Amino acid sequence: MAKCLLLLLLVVLSSLLGLPQALECFQCNRVNASGVCETGGSTCQTQGSQQCFLRRIFENGTLSYGHQGCSQLCIPMKLFNPSVIVEYKCCHDSPLCNKF
């Protein structure tokens, strides 16, 4: 009886503490400028401290292609080159938050 109560207490506490839950993210190695996955898109589940990410590449000011998925290391940033901009976005607030 005491073991059952202890187990129940652990379950309740873990839900109250907001322990990380797996998050579903869009996954595609190449998304075209129209937002269509060209490489057979799917979804992935984050594990541990992973986040969903979205990388978009702009060439001469026009969206060219992108990449989306789950990543252990995701730092939101924009990298600039005279003709290319690479934009990284990270999210972990809702399922499928990395929509292209």
UniProtKB/Swiss-Prot annotation:
Glycans are attached at residue 60. Residues 23-100 form the UPAR/Ly6 domain. Glycosylated. Residues 1-22 form the signal peptide. The keyword Cytoplasm does not apply. Its main location: secreted. It is found in: Secreted. One of its GO terms (molecular function) is collagen binding. GO terms for cellular component: extracellular space. Pfam families: UPAR_LY6. InterPro entries: LY6_UPA_recep-like. Disulfide bonds join 25-52, 28-37, 44-70, 74-90, 91-97. Expressed in placenta, where it is detected in both fetal tissues (cotyledon and intercotyledon) and maternal tissues (caruncle and intercaruncular endometrium) (at protein level). Expressed in the mesenchyme area of villi in the cotyledon (at protein level). In endometrium, expressed in the luminal epithelium and weakly in the subluminal stroma (at protein level). Detected in trophoblast mononucleate cells (TMCs) (at protein level). Also detected in trophoblast binucleate cells (BNCs). Overall, expression is strongest in fetal tissue and lower in maternal tissue. Keywords: Disulfide bond, Glycoprotein, Secreted, Signal. Binds specifically to type I collagen. This is Secreted protein of Ly-6 domain 1. It comes from Bos taurus (Bovine). The gene is SOLD1.
